[in-house]
Amino acid sequence: MSETSCVNATVAVVGNPASNKGKGAEVGKQVVELLQEAGRKHGFNVIDVTGESFDDSLANARNRRNEYDYLVAVGGDGMIALGANAVGCSGKPLGIVATGSGNDFARGLELPVNRVETAVDGIVGAIVRGTHIDVDMGLATSLQGGYAVDSSTGDDLVSDSDVPLRPAVNRFYAGMLSCGLDASINDRANHSRLPNGSVRYFVAAIVKLTHMKRYGYHIKATLADGTVEERDIISPLLTVANSRHIGGGIEISPYSRFSDGLLDLVWLDHAPNVAECVDAVSHAYSGKILGCKVFGWKRVRDIEITRAQEGDEPPVLMADGEYVGRLPVKVVVQDRALRVLVPPAVAESQAANTEEKVLEAIKRDHRDPVTGKTDTYYAKRSR
């Protein structure tokens, strides 16, 4: 694509002015100014569709979609989720300026993290050169009895006259749908008064890990080979992953690829003992955490998650760091539904992350690539 292809195009910027005690508004303004400067050089226009809140910004980005050709989301994983829900399945590219405390989706794509000028330069280069990748998303929708909550607080929604509201969940996510321990850690961190995001998350993790609950889930999943599996999972942790990272860099789902048409279900088989915790932590950032036998794993095309008869009540579900709703829910992979602006080097790197490399990692960890079970699969094949 030539440089003239972006002449008269419009780039919209969306941020969350309420984030980081108002600093999000300052960063959003900086991004607008940097893009305007680049637009004068390359011939594109810039508009700001940021609202007064997260939900207001999402509504603006959706309702004004016919006014722009590219959307640039400024903030953390929650703002990436906002962008995904604004332009997902539309073919309009999303640019990412990652300035949050987690930035796990951007990290998985090897995009700049907390480097505003570098991120904007990459977005401008991608617009001018026409470089992008198409990535999968998850679509979470309510089953009967499930409902959405306030995306900012996790509270049940009520009308102006305090009548409880039960709207259905209908939400794209780009990174993780957190259904257990990871959601409860995020929730505690969100309500913490500690000043630093990483410190809030670390302290919340310590508290929740030392008071671990066994949540009760019943799952019905279509696996990668098309077979259907139905079972109870009584576990502290259950995550439906599209990307690899969570919690600011922990590779909880190291086999995930952004464009394989699959989601990865990761859970704890049981509450880990001290030795198992040490083993998991030692592999948390190396891509080898699923070599720890305390974890269960399966690749799925879709999954229904309902409440099991036993186990503790699961917490409010969270996706990409934002509150989603209550079980029951169905999650379906949306194959290559989100177009993301990336520099050419990132596009090449993502293309190099092939299925063969993932299968090598699965084999290294002694797992069956279809059932996810450990040891027995490769023991049989070696006979």
Q: Residue ranges of each PLM-predicted region?
A:
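ATP/NTP phosphate-donor binding region
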Residues: M1-V74, A81, N85, D121, ...
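A residue-level signal for conserved active-site and pocket-lining positions in enzyme catalytic cores
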Residues: N16, D77, I185, L238, ...
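Glycine-rich beta-strand-to-loop/alpha-helix junction loops that act as flexible
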Residues: P17, V74-G76, V97-S101
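Short, glycine/serine-rich, charged loops/turns that create anion-binding
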Residues: A18-S19, S101, L181, R244-H245, ...
